[in-house]
């Protein structure tokens, strides 16, 4: 892939990551959300083949709006298929900086042992894997994807009381659903899904993540 195309891809991927962090409630500046390709080139370079930028230059650290101590890393490993050695390096950095959550943007996936290590480290350390291909577009901006809102525990309690329901009576959504992964929704959380409706203005459904 030539430098121009690769620079464009890295810009798109990082832009989606910034939107994802923002949508999860982390503090991202408007400038970062609106960064143009020209601004990306000026900041990081436009010769990936010569290490400008290297993928590691794109690392992001964000803090949550509600709790500045709740921080999240986004790592961009250099190697196409990520092995356990890289995961250990990331985990060590997270331990040193007292950060328990990270996203890893991979080019071609992970080795089986690296994948298993993510499972073994949870729930103390939550590392989520995204293929860069998934991040070239922001799935939540697709016109066919309705708005998803993660509900607080208080909102869920109120919802169940209002409709006299038990949580296990709610319809389900899989934790591996692409939109659920985008928002980092965990099993047991409830999502409010808002669709436009010609008759009612909007149509709301609720889903329990499983």
Curated annotation (Swiss-Prot):
A GO term for molecular function: DNA binding
Ranges in a coiled coil: none
Gene3D superfamilies documented for this protein: RNA polymerase, Rpb5, N-terminal domain, RPB5-like RNA polymerase subunit
Main location per the UniProt record: nucleus
Keyword Transferase tagged: no
Top-rank taxon: Eukaryota
SUPFAM superfamilies for the chain: Eukaryotic RPB5 N-terminal domain, RPB5-like RNA polymerase subunit
Transmembrane segments: none
Any GO BP: transcription by RNA polymerase II
One annotated Gene Ontology cellular component of this protein: RNA polymerase II, core complex
Xref: PROSITE patterns: RNA_POL_H_23KD (PS01110)
Localization (cell): Nucleus; Nucleus, Nucleolus
UniProt keyword list: Acetylation, DNA-directed RNA polymerase, Isopeptide bond, Nucleus, Transcription, Ubl conjugation
Family matches, as InterPro entries: Arch_Rpo5/euc_Rpb5, RNA_pol_Rpb5_N, RNA_pol_Rpb5_N_sf, RNA_pol_subH/Rpb5_C, RNA_pol_subH/Rpb5_CS, RPB5-like_sf
Modified residues (N-acetylmethionine): 1
UniProt keyword Acetylation present: yes
Cross-link type Glycyl lysine isopeptide (Lys-Gly) (interchain with G-Cter in SUMO2), residue numbers: 81
NCBIfam families: PRK09570.1
Function: DNA-dependent RNA polymerase catalyzes the transcription of DNA into RNA using the four ribonucleoside triphosphates as substrates. Common component of RNA polymerases I, II and III which synthesize ribosomal RNA precursors, mRNA precursors and many functional non-coding RNAs, and small RNAs, such as 5S rRNA and tRNAs, respectively. Pol II is the central component of the basal RNA polymerase II transcription machinery. Pols are composed of mobile elements that move relative to each other.
Similarity-based family: Belongs to the archaeal Rpo5/eukaryotic RPB5 RNA polymerase subunit family.
Record note on quaternary structure: Component of the RNA polymerase I (Pol I), RNA polymerase II (Pol II) and RNA polymerase III (Pol III) complexes consisting of at least 13, 12 and 17 subunits, respectively. Pol I complex consists of a ten-subunit catalytic core composed of POLR1A/RPA1, POLR1B/RPA2, POLR1C/RPAC1, POLR1D/RPAC2, POLR1H/RPA12, POLR2E/RPABC1, POLR2F/RPABC2, POLR2H/RPABC3, POLR2K/RPABC4 and POLR2L/RPABC5; a mobile stalk subunit POLR1F/RPA43 protruding from the core and additional subunits homologous to general transcription factors POLR1E/RPA49 and POLR1G/RPA34.
UniProt xrefs under HAMAP family: RNApol_Rpo5_RPB5
Protein name per the record: DNA-directed RNA polymerases I, II, and III subunit RPABC1
Protein's organism: Pongo abelii
